[in-house]
Amino acid sequence: MLLFIIFLFCNLLMVGVFFAVYGGKRPYAEGMLLGVHLPQEAADQAEVVALMDTFRRRTRRFYLVNLLLGVAVCLVAFWRFSPFLILWCLWLVEFVVGAQWLLLGTHRKLYDLKMARGWVVGEPATLAAADTRASAQRRGQGPGLVWHLLPCGLILTTLLLPGVRDFLLTQGSGWGLLGSGLAISLTLWALHAVLSRRGNKVYSQDTAVNQAVNRLERQVWGWTLLLSSLFNAAACWSAAWWMARAHWVGHTAYGIYLVLELLPAAILLTGMLGMARRRRQILAADPVPLVVDDDVYWRKGWYENPNDPRWLVQDRLVPYNYSMNMAKPGAWGGTIALLAGVGILLVGLCVLFLWADFGGSSVSITSERV
């Protein structure tokens, strides 16, 4: 029952997050529609409106079907875990690939339509625009990186509790909870470091607007990542409390741990959506926006510009995400290796639990011997 509840909650949350990020409304903003630069009059053309209506209709149907499938898959958990895990992995792959396919496919159709109709805004840029005054302004950028020592230190201090040390030495099952918690906080710390050191992006010919938007992005990223790390540390402390108090990590402990670990996801999502809304408000009031038609480098749905020295750039379709410059040496190799690693991990887990459910050792008892 607990397994059903945990995965049901995770599936519902995942579908909701994906819909908010990839399937939400796509209004005409910053001179773009679905990541494609278009004149306002072109965005109102009947064929463009029809394309976007089709995209919204298919998106709603796709997420509704996958919401129902995500609930149905969880019912298999009442039978055996290995068949459930296989079906869940298949559903997860279908859901992630389908969400990307819907978004990128429509983006490419809109780009092809733009080029066929000649709706080009200016000339494609080979290098990113720069605003030296905005780049020099670094104040008010959110919490410093040193603050991430706090959640990492809190997780490590759980090892000072005698009951926790005894549990880890005798049971060993708690190492996964505390180790994964520390890895999450270190990852959030590293992500904050990367984002805080990236160059300022130019949105406008007005330096004040550029400073406001870049300051907003760094503050939101900084605080959401730090708060997420603190809640992650709280999850580790909740598990450590059960280890020290009961010398056991049961269903209640895992449930509390899961809820506290899901709070960072809610914090990040809320922060990113709020940041995107506030950024649209700032740029909508900008009297001198900077429009650079670099759609040729985004025509496939990802960034591919050999003239740009950057490895990571702000994603065009999901502004609070980041895209790798696929024109860089090793970018494709690293992406394929990462996907292959995830695939091998999922297949390995499925095989392991299949063996545990159906191929493991058995014990038979008779009146004379075992």
Ranges and model annotations:
Residues 355-369:
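Alpha-helical transmembrane signal-anchor/signal-peptide segments
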Residues 20-37, 120-132, 274-327:
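Membrane-proximal soluble regions of multi-pass membrane proteins
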Residues 18-35, 98-119, 186-206, 269-285:
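Membrane-water interface of transmembrane alpha-helices
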Residues 333-353:
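Internal/C-terminal transmembrane anchor helices
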